[in-house]
Amino acid sequence: MAAVTAAAVSTSAAAAVTKASPSPAHCFLPCPPRTRAAHQRGLLLRAQVSTTDAAAVAAAPAKKEKISKKHDEGVVTNKYRPKEPYVGKCLLNTKITADDAPGETWHMVFSTEGEIPYREGQSIGVIADGVDKNGKPHKLRLYSIASSALGDFGDSKTVSLCVKRLVYTNDQGEIVKGVCSNFLCDLKPGSDVKITGPVGKEMLMPKDPNANIIMLATGTGIAPFRSFLWKMFFEKYDDYKFNGLAWLFLGVPTSSSLLYKEEFDKMKAKAPENFRVDYAVSREQTNAQGEKMYIQTRMAEYKEELWELLKKDHTYVYMCGLKGMEKGIDDIMVSLAAKDGIDWADYKKQLKKGEQWNVEVY
């Protein structure tokens, strides 16, 4: 499950203070008396310097304010913090993977009564009930929001998550359960849940309704893209109608692990010209060379088409999920860029600067 991380940076004010040199008015060394002519020359010199400075300021170009390409106007962050979280109610909690899937993933809906004004692409924090081994409250865990800003019920009063239950065996052979993921997956309707946020601006949707949006997800990294796609294809707005191309690549281990497939099938039937989806099922599929079908393997089948899209200034790439996917995708892009004499590392920096390459991996 991808999550937006936040870091607070503290800077010492003292480090920014520079000791000022004493002005001539405060100099106590004896100075020879100045003549009237010298005084006038001093005034003239100061006047010339002032005029030159003013001209330089006037000639300096005004700093251009950066205008974001994303829906960032009025975005709210950190309305609720760990010390004073919002307490919502679990309304729905459903397992969305088959019984034979390697691991459980749950879709859950919490009431917010409109008090958490999030946008598509943001995250919320959840604080599990109870205390840790030191007797302190559990730390929050961040989860990407899986619903549009209107919520699954369409009334802007709920928020949804897509959570995989974390269970693993450590080096000592002990079974370890992730505190927050198990707390969430075990929630019953009517239970309280402590929520913080919303947080994050990296994964906000583009403003342009004609944009090409390429979404790359593994597992529960699908969450923010479900929020995008609901807004694009399941909802109606007076000021937004998606007319571009939304292309989703989703990587999972087995077909029983595919998340929200029925929803995506409906979207594809509704808008075949605007929505494409390709799955990579690593334990069941292989490419022509017999290699396991990971997300980057599936993308390689369309690499020329993807590269041509990526060269357009209205194409945006969003990546969410396991960190390991990033290198495989970079490897594809390196060879494609090289054919055009482009250094991929430099080009990716330009894309990031232009908000066209957006990554949230863990």
Curated annotation (Swiss-Prot):
Q: Which PROSITE patterns match?
A: FAD_FR (PS51384)
Write the Enzyme Commission number(s) for this entry: 1.18.1.2
Recorded catalytic reaction(s): these are:
2 reduced [2Fe-2S]-[ferredoxin] + NADP(+) + H(+) = 2 oxidized [2Fe-2S]-[ferredoxin] + NADPH
Q: Which cysteines are joined by disulfide bonds?
A: C180-C185
Gene symbol here is LFNR1
Where, in this chain's numbering, is NADP(+) bound? S144, K164, T220, V252, P253, S282, R283, K292, G321, L322, E360
Q: Where is the transit peptide?
A: 1-62
Keyword set, alphabetical order: Chloroplast, Disulfide bond, Electron transport, FAD, Flavoprotein, Membrane, NADP, Oxidoreductase, Phosphoprotein, Photosynthesis, Plastid, Thylakoid, Transit peptide, Transport
Domain of life (superkingdom):
Eukaryota
Q: Which GO BP annotation is one of this protein's?
A: electron transport chain
Q: What is this protein called?
A: Ferredoxin--NADP reductase, leaf isozyme 1, chloroplastic
Family label: Belongs to the ferredoxin--NADP reductase type 1 family.
Task: State the membrane topology.
Answer: Peripheral membrane protein
Alphabetized Gene3D superfamilies for the sequence: Nucleotide-binding domain of ferredoxin-NADP reductase (FNR) module (3.40.50.80), Translation factors (2.40.30.10)
* EC top class named in words: oxidoreductase
Q: Where in the cell is it found?
A: Plastid, Chloroplast stroma; Plastid, Chloroplast thylakoid membrane
Modifications made to the protein after synthesis = May form interchain disulfide bonds with LIR1.
Cofactor list = FAD
Where the protein is mainly located, per its record?
plastid
For this protein, the record's InterPro entries field holds: FAD-bd_FR_type, Flavoprot_Pyr_Nucl_cyt_Rdtase, FNR, FNR_nucleotide-bd, FNR_plant_Cyanobacteria, OxRdtase_FAD/NAD-bd, Riboflavin_synthase-like_b-brl
Q: Outline the subunit composition.
A: Component of high molecular weight thylakoid LFNRs-containing protein complexes containing LIR1, LFNR1, LFNR2, TIC62 and TROL proteins. Interacts directly with LIR1 and TIC62; LIR1 increases the affinity of LFNR1 and LFNR2 for TIC62.
Residue intervals of the FAD-binding FR-type domain: 83-205
Q: Which residues carry this modification: Phosphoserine?
A: S181
| Residues the entry annotates as binding FAD | R141, L142, Y143, S144, C162, V163, K164, Y168, V179, C180, S181, T220
Q: Which GO terms describe its molecular function?
A: electron transfer activity; ferredoxin-NADP+ reductase activity
Briefly, what is this protein's role?
Answer: May play a key role in regulating the relative amounts of cyclic and non-cyclic electron flow to meet the demands of the plant for ATP and reducing power.
- Give the UniProt entry's GO cellular component terms: chloroplast stroma; chloroplast thylakoid membrane protein complex
